[in-house]
Amino acid sequence: MVLYIILAIIVIILIAVGVLFYLRSNKRQIIEKAIERKNEIETLPFDQNLAQLSKLNLKGETKTKYDAMKKDNVESTNKYLAPVEEKIHNAEALLDKFSFNASQSEIDDANELMDSYEQSYQQQLEDVNEIIALYKDNDELYDKCKVDYREMKRDVLANRHQFGEAASLLETEIEKFEPRLEQYEVLKADGNYVQAHNHIAALNEQMKQLRSYMEEIPELIRETQKELPGQFQDLKYGCRDLKVEGYDLDHVKVDSTLQSLKTELSFVEPLISRLELEEANDKLANINDKLDDMYDLIEHEVKAKNDVEETKDIITDNLFKAKDMNYTLQTEIEYVRENYYINESDAQSVRQFENEIQSLISVYDDILKEMSKSAVRYSEVQDNLQYLEDHVTVINDKQEKLQNHLIQLREDEAEAEDNLLRVQSKKEEVYRRLLASNLTSVPERFIIMKNEIDHEVRDVNEQFSERPIHVKQLKDKVSKIVIQMNTFEDEANDVLVNAVYAEKLIQYGNRYRKDYSNVDKSLNEAERLFKNNRYKRAIEIAEQVLESVEPGVTKHIEEEVIKQ
């Protein structure tokens, strides 16, 4: 037993030793990778990067940057690369002692140092590339500026007439570029690449601005010397022609406004000659705005004349229509009021319309007189005609509505008479049906309803014979009589149907009288009620007793009665 225990312990120890050696083998691979990485980063070409700068002009800012980067290389090597060897050595020693965690910590420190060293290299590479790129950009901008300088100088010399009085100042401004180009060469020669870049970039922007001035100045001069004076002339003679055609353009103030614009235009060329183009553009924009305002006023007058010519005849027709309709209404009202009641306000409205129409005709005559003058302001005429058109349209609408009302009075009277005749005819027809029915006698309420309808009809007929007639009151009374007649007819139909139904029920029940005493008794009661004109109650009793001996028969009898 002891032997087994000893063997087990030995096995465990052997396994533990094996695991330790396995772990140390793995850790040693990590150390070997760190050594390989150290060997790789030792070959990073710091010096080659700096060698690219040495090809440049190592003076001034370039020399300062070069020295700083060289110093950074030494510091990076001492601070980051040199301690790596020691860290790796310590890791190996600790690993031999099976201190895995401590060994790993040393390796981690070594990797962090190498990361920092690589970052230092990347930063140096970016700085070098940035300096080289800046040198390249500077040279490209410098070459472009030299080309622009020569081209601008040549353009002013070859096309001096296009720039007018601004040519001299342009030449002066262009000549200022030459010493600034030379200054760039000095900055570059001194190695001050940042200052050189700022200088040449600013110079390039100034050249671009002056180039844009050179492109804009001929257009401004053309507008100032040719286009606007031409528009002034066209506007002046155009207005003169329109005045000959009869337009009143005094409100446009052509002469005074043009003189003011010419004075304002005279200040533009001096601004151009001083290269104050923004102020020159503002003045030109103001002049063009005022010209547009004048053109708008003139165009409005021309359109107003066309509109006046189109609407004049329409307004004439509408005024004549209003006058004729007013005369017709006055005549018609005098005739109609003899036969029909008319509100006094309607008659007053017609007289008021007459006064308004006469007033509008007077205004229209004044407008025509104004249009016959040698100079007419058509915009005012247009406004006045619009006023006339609006008012005469309202008057015509109101007169037409009143005329329709007068026509409607006659139509309403005829309709009321027709309805009254239909009521009389229908009343007699219904009453004849009551008399000819199987009723023992005509119920008293129908006699009363008939007499009431007769009384109302006589009353309305008397009102029809009176003059003037109040049509609305008559129409309302006839409508009430029609309602009475409808009620009379509906109730009469109900009674007639109930009487037939009750009679059919009693006749059908006679077959059960001998066999069923209760049937005989109930039918006797139903007959009594029938004779007293109580048809609904007679139906209830007859239905009840028939259903007791023959279920469903009453529904069949009712359907036959309805079909008849």
From Swiss-Prot:
GO cellular component, one term: septin ring
Membrane-side (Cytoplasmic) residue stretches: 24-564
Parts forming coiled coils: 99-138, 190-223, 271-300, 350-435, 471-550
Keywords, comma-separated and alphabetical: Cell cycle, Cell division, Cell membrane, Coiled coil, Membrane, Septation, Transmembrane, Transmembrane helix
Recorded topology in the membrane: Single-pass membrane protein
Transmembrane segments: 5-23
Record carries keyword Membrane: yes
Pfam families according to UniProt: EzrA (PF06160)
Family, per entry: Belongs to the EzrA family.
Function, as annotated: Negative regulator of FtsZ ring formation; modulates the frequency and position of FtsZ ring formation. Inhibits FtsZ ring formation at polar sites. Interacts either with FtsZ or with one of its binding partners to promote depolymerization.
Protein name, entry field: Septation ring formation regulator EzrA
Protein species of origin: Staphylococcus aureus (strain Mu3 / ATCC 700698)
Gene for this chain: ezrA
